[in-house]
Amino acid sequence: MKKLTALWDIDEQLDSVHRDIELQEMILDSRLANTGCLFVAIKGHRVDGREFIMQAIQNGASAVLFETDLVEQHLTVSFEQNIPLIAYYELSKHLSHIADRFYSSPSQRLTLVGVTGTNGKTTIAQLLAQWTQILGHTSAVMGTIGNGLFGQIKEASNTTGSAIEIQSSLDKFIRQGADFAAIEVSSHGLVQHRVEALTFRAGIFTNLSRDHLDYHHTMENYAQAKKRLFSELNCQHKILNVDDEIGATWLIELSKDDPDVVAVSCRADYQPDTKNWLKATALSFHSKGTTIEFASSWGNGILSSPLIGGFNVSNLLLVLATLLSLGYDIGKLLATVRQLTGVCGRMEMLSAKHKATVIVDYAHTPDALENALQSAAVHCQGKLWCIFGCGGDRDRGKRPLMAAIAEKFADSVIVTDDNPRTENPEQIMQDILTGFQQSSAVQIIHQREQAIKTALQSAVENDVVLIAGKGHENYQIIGTTKYHFSDQEIVKKYF
């Protein structure tokens, strides 16, 4: 609980009654306003929260903090129905720091690890929380699948929540007993200053490939957004995938000011020239997962993991390097790695006797689809099937690229609907089809359930069917409505 006057120096503008206002929470949604809350009205990309100030007051908000475009209005107080309205210049940019102060700097009261990159964020965040929990911690996670203590995750609307949601969630996790948290840090979250005030004990870079160009416009802008986690924010340990060209470049740049940057590679021939490093020296893929021999500046060892896919080698090594950087004992890590389990919708394998093997994966970018298909091929002794689509109201440029990848790596391709949102599914399909050299060989089935059913009825034992794009999602967005839909449920229905 915070007093209004403890947050800003505005005593002289308030009478004794308003000086004693006690606030219990910060909120952005006026519909959730109630007594004891500070309603925050920011100028968003789609909605201007200032238009809902009166609704928040009517619902019981005890005070309002709103964004002003005029620097001379900064921290001036006005009143509406005896409720104080505090103007704040460039509020969006400073909201993370305000929420940090309001919730007593929660990121400094536990071990927080941030994960950024195009692919792998969810798997790495989940593995960090899972592994530390196995080692005796109470761990939390925030990201694409949802937020909460590990094993008690609730669905979230964005990969990286609002500045307020992040700080309030961390505070809540601590009150629930958490001492470790892993958070997926999206490029949007970095550009929009949502993680600005966080103290990261470690930050991980996974990789960079085409995604979100509808927002960032260029790959250079996209890369610079990701780099902010390491170059501009409070990040103690920096763990980089140097097999990625951007990661290798950042290693050189960041090492100039921080000699402890950690280089991670899946290549046995990688020659580290940094103080801290970890690399795979031998890999073995089998039906039960992957075995990884590694060498590192902390020592050598063997990891046996149930995770499938070459890119999960990189994910697991990045997790291992992070925990070693944080001081975890290498012996305890190697002794517990077998207890790790896969992540929902991330190369999730479903099988039944005398049926094709099905892999459900979240792959929705060209690079992710290529990785998923190459990984699926390792476990395929027959035909490799690929079912995919592309989301509506998103980057159109990646659609033909994904088609070309599906055609190159799969034996049979079915193009279906993903989340068309408000875009015409037929237009999405036409964009995709331009990427095929022989589109006549491709099956087009808009209804996603029918597409999955067709593949499962056609595929035979020893075939592998990759269902890409939705992963953990249990919904399909058509228009502006979310309908219940789960790839996994459909597979089990027709198995």
From Swiss-Prot:
Record-level Gene Ontology MF annotations: ATP binding; magnesium ion binding; UDP-N-acetylmuramoylalanyl-D-glutamate-2,6-diaminopimelate ligase activity
Gene3D superfamilies named among the record's database cross-references: Mur ligase, C-terminal domain (3.90.190.20), Mur-like, catalytic domain (3.40.1190.10), MurE/MurF, N-terminal domain (3.40.1390.10)
EC number, UniProt record: 6.3.2.13
Taxonomy, superkingdom: Bacteria
Cofactor: Mg(2+)
Record PTM: Carboxylation is probably crucial for Mg(2+) binding and, consequently, for the gamma-phosphate positioning of ATP.
Record field: catalytic activity: UDP-N-acetyl-alpha-D-muramoyl-L-alanyl-D-glutamate + meso-2,6-diaminopimelate + ATP = UDP-N-acetyl-alpha-D-muramoyl-L-alanyl-gamma-D-glutamyl-meso-2,6-diaminopimelate + ADP + phosphate + H(+)
Protein name per UniProt: UDP-N-acetylmuramoyl-L-alanyl-D-glutamate--2,6-diaminopimelate ligase
Organism: Histophilus somni (strain 129Pt) (Haemophilus somnus)
Gene: murE
